[in-house]
Amino acid sequence: MDEGGGAGAAAAAAGNAAGAAVHHNARSAEDVFRDFRARRAGIVKALTTDVEKFYRQCDPEKENLCLYGLPNETWDVTLPAEEVPPELPEPALGINFARDGMIEKDWLSLVAVHSDAWLLSVAFYFGARFGFDKEARRRLFTMINGLPTVYEVVTGIAKKQTKVSNGSSKSNKSNPKPSKQSNSNSKPAKPPQPKDEEDSGPEGAEDEDQAYMCGACGETYANGEFWICCDVCEKWFHGKCVRITPAKAEHIKQYKCPGCSSKRSRE
């Protein structure tokens, strides 16, 4: 349900009906975290890989619009729910009004911050609704805190936490990481290469837990996955998140992620 617009009924589907599935089926911190992670993935997608579509849908001429992350990892830009009080906490109203009055990256960062607050409010709403005790709330928060925030993904802070070294060749199979090809054309990366032995000490191991986060979904690198690096912003992406296969990457001389491509088209 990536297409925006619609009326209050669409908002109900985005927020209330979507939350009903969690309400009836989930009773554990792990279930609520799965819902949080899916909604977060949808919002990250709206603000990164689908940013051009998201930008168009946030027309300042329309009424107060909200960005919803849905439990199926998609997103929706629509009006808030009509019922008062709403079944679920509502996201920030009127995100579209500030679109043309701000630098685009600042506007996206603002939406990201409000989205982080909304995601937390929905997760802990479910926690209260299901009667989570102190330990369940702590477990839920710990799992949530293990992911970078939407703001960190959108602004690139998550990526900057650890510098990516180019062209590594020595192997340490226990600490794999993506490796960008070091040729002059900066072609997209092949499946990630392992980590240098010299970086495998305690400090390197600590950084490894936070490094190599996908610029689209925010998830960390897992051994054997195909990743690709944008030659403009130098963010890494799962091939599946940006619809690039290893075969397709072979024929790309300079790869631009969806965010950089759409930004240049609007300049």
Swiss-Prot record:
Compartments reported by the entry? Nucleus
| Gene Ontology cellular component list | nucleus
Q: Does the keyword Nucleotide-binding apply?
A: no
**Any GO molecular function:** transcription cis-regulatory region binding
Q: Write out the biased-composition intervals (Acidic residues).
A: 196-207
The site feature described as Histone H3K4me3 binding is recorded at: Y221, W227, D231, W236
Q: Which InterPro entries match?
A: Alfin (IPR045104), Alfin_N (IPR021998), PHD_AL_plant (IPR044104), Zinc_finger_PHD-type_CS (IPR019786), Znf_FYVE_PHD (IPR011011), Znf_PHD (IPR001965), Znf_PHD-finger (IPR019787), Znf_RING/FYVE/PHD (IPR013083)
**Listed SUPFAM superfamilies:** FYVE/PHD zinc finger
Q: Which UniProt keywords apply?
A: Chromatin regulator, Metal-binding, Nucleus, Transcription, Transcription regulation, Zinc, Zinc-finger
Q: Which Gene3D superfamilies match?
A: Zinc/RING finger domain, C3HC4 (zinc finger)
Q: Name one GO biological process term.
A: regulation of DNA-templated transcription
Q: Segment Disordered: which positions? A: 162-207
A Pfam family: PHD
Primary place of residence? nucleus
Zn finger residue spans: PHD-type: 211-263
Give start-end positions of Low complexity composition bias: 165-188
Q: Which family does it belong to?
A: Belongs to the Alfin family.
On assembly, the entry states:
Interacts with H3K4me3 and to a lesser extent with H3K4me2.
Functionally, this protein is described as follows: Histone-binding component that specifically recognizes H3 tails trimethylated on 'Lys-4' (H3K4me3), which mark transcription start sites of virtually all active genes.
Share the domain note from the entry: The PHD-type zinc finger mediates the binding to H3K4me3.
| PANTHER family in UniProt | CPG BINDING PROTEIN, PHD FINGER PROTEIN ALFIN-LIKE 7
State the name under which the record lists this protein. PHD finger protein ALFIN-LIKE 7
Give the originating organism: Oryza sativa subsp. indica (Rice)
Q: Give the organism's phylogenetic lineage.
A: Eukaryota, Viridiplantae, Streptophyta, Embryophyta, Tracheophyta
